[in-house]
């Protein structure tokens, strides 16, 4: 689960860089939307990773 959280964090950063720097000016709105989606998914998978790990360890 933590691997997925890291994956979504990297994808969110890449989408943000492309969307906010003007590199892909035509797709900036799509990149901003994807940035928010991937940040939310990153947080969800990060929390799930910690919850599952805690249940496995206990």
Curated annotation (Swiss-Prot):
The keyword Membrane applies. Disulfide bonds: none annotated. Keywords: Cell membrane, Membrane, Transmembrane, Transmembrane helix. The chain crosses the membrane at residues 4-24, 33-53. It is a multi-pass membrane protein. Belongs to the UPF0391 family. HAMAP family: UPF0391. This is UPF0391 membrane protein Bxeno_A2959. It comes from Paraburkholderia xenovorans (strain LB400).
